[in-house]
């Protein structure tokens, strides 16, 4: 499924920023359960990060996360603020945890986007994440594509 999503995502990416190559990773133990991740776009630098990470976490859900840091956080923050209502309506949550590598959508890591006062205020990174439940397995590729399109659309302002 992730390989298929990778091709869909490549067709949807229209940003000015070169997205890098898609990467699919898998493992057996994210908090005790197997996982698969697709990163596209995928720009991971020491100071600057731009990634849209789609994760399947066995027994939990699919999630799609926009991960920004450094110059990409500065570039995208005004667009996120301007499109906040639409992102919230699509089910996106904002990262509030201190560990940028925690992906599970739980209260210690994420809050509803419309429940926070200031987006990205004083934080070293910014993450927006939405989930697609396993009860929507058949629809998941389409729904993840729509969520990706919403995030990727911000790259064209």
Q: What are the roles of these predicted feature ranges?
A:
Residues 1-10, 107-157:
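Long, solvent-exposed, polar/charged low-complexity segments
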Residues 31-86:
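Aromatic- and glycine-enriched beta-alpha-beta binding-site module
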Residues 41, 95-97, 131:
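A structural detector for beta-sheet-dominated domains
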Residues 1-44:
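Charge-rich, low-complexity N-terminal segments
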Residues 20, 28, 34-36, 49-50, ...:
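Soluble extramembrane domains of integral membrane proteins
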Residues 69-120:
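Short, internal acidic amphipathic alpha-helical interface segments
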């Amino acid at each position: 499924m992730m390989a298929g999503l990778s091709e869909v995502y490549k067709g949807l990416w229209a940003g000015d920023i070169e997205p890098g190559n898609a990467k699919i990773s898998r493992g057996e133990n994210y908090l005790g359960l197997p996982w698969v991740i697709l990163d596209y776009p995928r720009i991971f630098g020491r100071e600057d990060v731009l990634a849209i990470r789609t994760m399947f976490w066995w027994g939990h859900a699919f999630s799609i996360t926009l991960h920004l840091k450094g110059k990409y956080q500065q570039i995208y923050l005004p667009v996120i603020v301007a499109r906040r209502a639409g992102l919230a309506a699509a089910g996106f949550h904002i990262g509030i945890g201190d560990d940028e590598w925690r992906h599970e959508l739980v209260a210690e890591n994420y809050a509803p986007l419309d429940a926070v006062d200031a987006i990205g205020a004083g934080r070293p990174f910014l993450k927006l994440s939405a989930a697609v439940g396993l009860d929507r397995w058949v629809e998941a590729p389409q729904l993840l594509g729509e969520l990706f399109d919403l995030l990727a659309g911000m790259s064209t302002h």
